[in-house]
Amino acid sequence: MTINNSNIQTDLPNSENCDLKNETLNIYFNEPIPIIKHCTNKDTPTNINNNNNNNNNNNNNNNINNNNNNNNNNNNNNNNNNNNNNNNNNNNNNNNINNNNNNNNINFSCNHILPQSALNSGICANSNPTIFLDKFKIIDLRPSGSGAKKGHGFPTIAPMEISHLINENEFSKFMKSFNRVFNYFFLLLFNVVFLIAGIIFPIFISRISILWAVVGSVGIFIIGGIFYCCINKYINGKRVGFISII
Protein backbone atom coordinates (compact mmCIF):
# COMPACT_ATOMS: atom_id res chain seq x y z
CA MET A 1 0.00 0.00 0.00
CA THR A 2 1.30 3.41 -0.95
CA ILE A 3 0.23 6.48 1.01
CA ASN A 4 1.32 9.87 -0.26
CA ASN A 5 0.25 12.68 2.02
CA SER A 6 1.73 15.73 3.68
CA ASN A 7 -1.05 16.23 6.22
CA ILE A 8 -2.38 12.96 7.59
CA GLN A 9 -4.75 13.48 10.50
CA THR A 10 -5.46 10.69 12.96
CA ASP A 11 -7.96 12.26 15.35
CA LEU A 12 -10.74 9.91 14.31
CA PRO A 13 -14.08 10.91 15.88
CA ASN A 14 -15.40 8.23 18.21
CA SER A 15 -19.06 8.86 17.52
CA GLU A 16 -21.49 6.00 17.19
CA ASN A 17 -22.47 6.97 13.68
CA CYS A 18 -18.85 7.59 12.64
CA ASP A 19 -19.85 10.89 11.11
CA LEU A 20 -17.26 11.62 8.44
CA LYS A 21 -19.49 13.54 6.06
CA ASN A 22 -17.19 16.54 6.06
CA GLU A 23 -14.04 14.50 5.50
CA THR A 24 -12.54 14.06 2.06
CA LEU A 25 -10.20 11.28 1.01
CA ASN A 26 -8.60 11.48 -2.41
CA ILE A 27 -7.78 7.91 -3.38
CA TYR A 28 -6.08 6.47 -6.43
CA PHE A 29 -6.87 2.80 -7.00
CA ASN A 30 -3.85 0.61 -7.64
CA GLU A 31 -3.31 -1.79 -4.73
CA PRO A 32 -5.58 -3.37 -2.09
CA ILE A 33 -6.56 -1.00 0.70
CA PRO A 34 -6.60 -2.66 4.15
CA ILE A 35 -8.28 0.37 5.73
CA ILE A 36 -11.84 0.16 7.03
CA LYS A 37 -13.82 1.96 9.69
CA HIS A 38 -16.30 -0.34 11.40
CA CYS A 39 -19.43 1.36 12.64
CA THR A 40 -22.50 0.38 14.57
CA ASN A 41 -24.83 1.71 11.88
CA LYS A 42 -24.05 -1.12 9.47
CA ASP A 43 -27.06 -0.36 7.29
CA THR A 44 -25.90 3.16 6.51
CA PRO A 45 -24.88 3.28 2.85
CA THR A 46 -21.45 4.32 1.75
CA ASN A 47 -21.62 6.92 -0.98
CA ILE A 48 -18.50 7.23 -3.09
CA ASN A 49 -17.70 9.74 -5.81
CA ASN A 50 -15.28 7.82 -8.00
CA ASN A 51 -13.54 10.08 -10.52
CA ASN A 52 -11.68 7.72 -12.83
CA ASN A 53 -10.71 7.64 -16.51
CA ASN A 54 -11.64 4.48 -18.38
CA ASN A 55 -11.32 2.04 -15.48
CA ASN A 56 -12.25 -1.62 -15.29
CA ASN A 57 -14.08 -1.99 -11.98
CA ASN A 58 -15.29 -5.17 -10.35
CA ASN A 59 -17.62 -4.12 -7.55
CA ASN A 60 -20.10 -5.77 -5.19
CA ASN A 61 -22.76 -4.32 -2.87
CA ASN A 62 -22.89 -0.94 -4.59
CA ASN A 63 -25.26 1.16 -6.71
CA ILE A 64 -23.24 2.62 -9.54
CA ASN A 65 -23.82 5.67 -11.71
CA ASN A 66 -21.03 5.98 -14.25
CA ASN A 67 -21.01 9.36 -15.98
CA ASN A 68 -18.01 9.41 -18.31
CA ASN A 69 -18.52 11.64 -21.33
CA ASN A 70 -16.27 9.84 -23.77
CA ASN A 71 -17.48 6.83 -25.75
CA ASN A 72 -20.57 4.69 -25.44
CA ASN A 73 -18.96 1.25 -25.43
CA ASN A 74 -20.36 -0.87 -22.62
CA ASN A 75 -19.66 -4.39 -21.42
CA ASN A 76 -21.60 -4.74 -18.18
CA ASN A 77 -22.48 -7.65 -15.93
CA ASN A 78 -24.60 -6.17 -13.16
CA ASN A 79 -26.85 -7.52 -10.39
CA ASN A 80 -29.26 -5.27 -8.46
CA ASN A 81 -27.69 -2.05 -9.69
CA ASN A 82 -28.64 1.39 -10.93
CA ASN A 83 -26.16 1.84 -13.78
CA ASN A 84 -25.55 4.58 -16.32
CA ASN A 85 -22.37 3.40 -18.03
CA ASN A 86 -20.25 5.03 -20.70
CA ASN A 87 -16.94 3.53 -21.83
CA ASN A 88 -16.47 1.19 -18.83
CA ASN A 89 -16.27 -2.55 -18.29
CA ASN A 90 -17.96 -3.12 -14.94
CA ASN A 91 -19.06 -6.08 -12.86
CA ASN A 92 -21.04 -4.41 -10.11
CA ASN A 93 -23.41 -5.34 -7.28
CA ASN A 94 -25.21 -2.85 -5.01
CA ASN A 95 -22.78 0.09 -4.91
CA ASN A 96 -23.28 3.85 -4.92
CA ILE A 97 -20.48 5.02 -7.19
CA ASN A 98 -20.31 8.03 -9.47
CA ASN A 99 -17.56 7.86 -12.06
CA ASN A 100 -17.04 11.38 -13.35
CA ASN A 101 -13.80 11.14 -15.31
CA ASN A 102 -11.71 13.46 -13.13
CA ASN A 103 -8.06 12.71 -12.40
CA ASN A 104 -8.49 9.29 -10.81
CA ASN A 105 -9.64 10.63 -7.45
CA ILE A 106 -12.25 9.13 -5.18
CA ASN A 107 -13.95 11.43 -2.72
CA PHE A 108 -15.45 9.61 0.25
CA SER A 109 -18.50 11.30 1.66
CA CYS A 110 -20.10 8.78 3.94
CA ASN A 111 -21.34 7.86 7.38
CA HIS A 112 -19.06 4.87 7.57
CA ILE A 113 -16.50 3.06 5.48
CA LEU A 114 -17.15 -0.37 4.08
CA PRO A 115 -16.58 -3.26 6.51
CA GLN A 116 -13.93 -5.85 5.75
CA SER A 117 -16.46 -8.23 4.19
CA ALA A 118 -17.51 -5.54 1.75
CA LEU A 119 -13.89 -4.63 1.12
CA ASN A 120 -12.95 -8.21 0.25
CA SER A 121 -15.93 -8.74 -2.05
CA GLY A 122 -16.59 -5.18 -3.13
CA ILE A 123 -14.92 -2.20 -4.70
CA CYS A 124 -11.45 -2.99 -3.40
CA ALA A 125 -11.37 -6.70 -4.09
CA ASN A 126 -10.50 -6.66 -7.76
CA SER A 127 -9.69 -3.05 -8.58
CA ASN A 128 -6.49 -3.08 -6.44
CA PRO A 129 -6.48 0.45 -5.04
CA THR A 130 -3.55 2.51 -3.79
CA ILE A 131 -4.37 5.45 -1.58
CA PHE A 132 -3.32 9.07 -2.08
CA LEU A 133 -4.72 11.10 0.80
CA ASP A 134 -5.38 14.75 1.45
CA LYS A 135 -7.39 14.17 4.60
CA PHE A 136 -7.31 10.90 6.43
CA LYS A 137 -9.18 10.15 9.64
CA ILE A 138 -10.12 6.54 9.03
CA ILE A 139 -7.57 4.24 10.61
CA ASP A 140 -9.39 1.69 12.74
CA LEU A 141 -8.90 -1.81 11.42
CA ARG A 142 -10.35 -4.74 13.32
CA PRO A 143 -8.69 -8.16 13.37
CA SER A 144 -10.57 -11.16 12.06
CA GLY A 145 -10.21 -14.90 12.52
CA SER A 146 -9.84 -17.00 15.65
CA GLY A 147 -6.13 -16.26 16.01
CA ALA A 148 -6.27 -12.51 15.48
CA LYS A 149 -5.86 -10.22 18.44
CA LYS A 150 -6.31 -6.50 18.63
CA GLY A 151 -3.07 -4.58 18.35
CA HIS A 152 -0.89 -7.65 17.83
CA GLY A 153 1.29 -6.69 14.91
CA PHE A 154 0.45 -6.80 11.24
CA PRO A 155 -1.15 -10.07 10.12
CA THR A 156 -0.66 -11.28 6.57
CA ILE A 157 -4.35 -10.72 5.83
CA ALA A 158 -5.57 -7.15 5.55
CA PRO A 159 -7.88 -6.97 8.63
CA MET A 160 -6.00 -5.49 11.56
CA GLU A 161 -6.19 -2.60 13.96
CA ILE A 162 -3.96 0.43 13.77
CA SER A 163 -4.81 2.58 16.76
CA HIS A 164 -2.29 5.27 15.97
CA LEU A 165 -0.50 6.38 12.84
CA ILE A 166 2.60 8.58 13.01
CA ASN A 167 1.96 11.00 10.19
CA GLU A 168 4.56 12.87 8.22
CA ASN A 169 4.29 15.97 10.38
CA GLU A 170 4.77 13.98 13.58
CA PHE A 171 7.60 12.00 12.03
CA SER A 172 9.26 15.20 10.85
CA LYS A 173 9.05 16.67 14.36
CA PHE A 174 10.43 13.44 15.80
CA MET A 175 13.37 13.44 13.39
CA LYS A 176 14.13 17.08 14.13
CA SER A 177 14.15 16.36 17.87
CA PHE A 178 16.24 13.24 17.32
CA ASN A 179 18.73 15.12 15.16
CA ARG A 180 18.95 17.91 17.71
CA VAL A 181 19.75 15.46 20.52
CA PHE A 182 22.09 13.58 18.20
CA ASN A 183 23.89 16.81 17.33
CA TYR A 184 24.26 17.82 20.97
CA PHE A 185 25.63 14.37 21.76
CA PHE A 186 28.23 14.63 19.01
CA LEU A 187 29.00 18.19 20.01
CA LEU A 188 29.65 17.13 23.59
CA LEU A 189 31.53 14.02 22.49
CA PHE A 190 33.91 15.82 20.17
CA ASN A 191 34.38 18.74 22.53
CA VAL A 192 35.32 16.47 25.41
CA VAL A 193 37.36 13.95 23.44
CA PHE A 194 39.31 16.43 21.40
CA LEU A 195 39.70 18.83 24.30
CA ILE A 196 41.25 16.05 26.37
CA ALA A 197 43.34 14.97 23.40
CA GLY A 198 44.41 18.57 22.83
CA ILE A 199 45.57 18.81 26.44
CA ILE A 200 47.16 15.39 26.80
CA PHE A 201 48.87 15.38 23.40
CA PRO A 202 51.14 18.38 24.15
CA ILE A 203 52.23 16.78 27.41
CA PHE A 204 53.73 13.86 25.55
CA ILE A 205 55.02 15.82 22.58
CA SER A 206 56.32 18.82 24.55
CA ARG A 207 59.42 16.84 25.31
CA ILE A 208 60.24 17.17 21.62
CA SER A 209 59.03 20.69 20.87
CA ILE A 210 56.52 23.19 22.25
CA LEU A 211 55.77 24.25 18.67
CA TRP A 212 54.77 20.72 17.72
CA ALA A 213 52.62 20.54 20.85
CA VAL A 214 50.68 23.65 19.81
CA VAL A 215 50.37 22.50 16.19
CA GLY A 216 49.22 19.07 17.31
CA SER A 217 46.64 20.48 19.70
CA VAL A 218 45.18 22.84 17.10
CA GLY A 219 45.29 20.09 14.49
CA ILE A 220 43.28 17.77 16.70
CA PHE A 221 40.55 20.40 17.07
CA ILE A 222 40.51 21.06 13.32
CA ILE A 223 40.33 17.38 12.41
CA GLY A 224 37.60 16.82 14.99
CA GLY A 225 35.63 19.80 13.73
CA ILE A 226 35.87 18.69 10.10
CA PHE A 227 34.83 15.17 11.05
CA TYR A 228 31.86 16.47 13.05
CA CYS A 229 30.74 18.79 10.26
CA CYS A 230 30.89 15.95 7.74
CA ILE A 231 28.87 13.65 10.00
CA ASN A 232 26.29 16.35 10.69
CA LYS A 233 26.00 17.27 7.02
CA TYR A 234 25.45 13.63 6.14
CA ILE A 235 22.70 13.30 8.74
CA ASN A 236 20.96 16.65 8.50
CA GLY A 237 21.99 17.79 5.05
CA LYS A 238 23.37 21.04 6.41
CA ARG A 239 26.68 22.40 7.62
CA VAL A 240 27.52 23.38 11.16
CA GLY A 241 29.74 26.31 11.96
CA PHE A 242 33.10 25.21 13.30
CA ILE A 243 32.91 27.89 16.00
CA SER A 244 29.87 26.12 17.53
CA ILE A 245 31.94 22.97 17.95
CA ILE A 246 34.68 24.75 19.86
From Swiss-Prot:
Q: Could you tell me which residues belong to the region Disordered?
A: 46-100
Question: What is its membrane topology?
Answer: Multi-pass membrane protein
Biased composition range(s): Low complexity? 47-100
Membrane keyword on record: yes
List, alphabetically, the InterPro entries matched: Golvesin-related_Golgi (IPR053259)
What taxonomic lineage is listed for the species of origin? Eukaryota, Amoebozoa, Evosea, Eumycetozoa, Dictyostelia
Q: Transmembrane ranges?
A: 185-205, 208-228
Localisation: Membrane
> Keyword Transmembrane: yes or no?
yes
What is the name of this protein? Putative uncharacterized transmembrane protein DDB_G0292500
Q: Which UniProt keywords apply?
A: Membrane, Transmembrane, Transmembrane helix
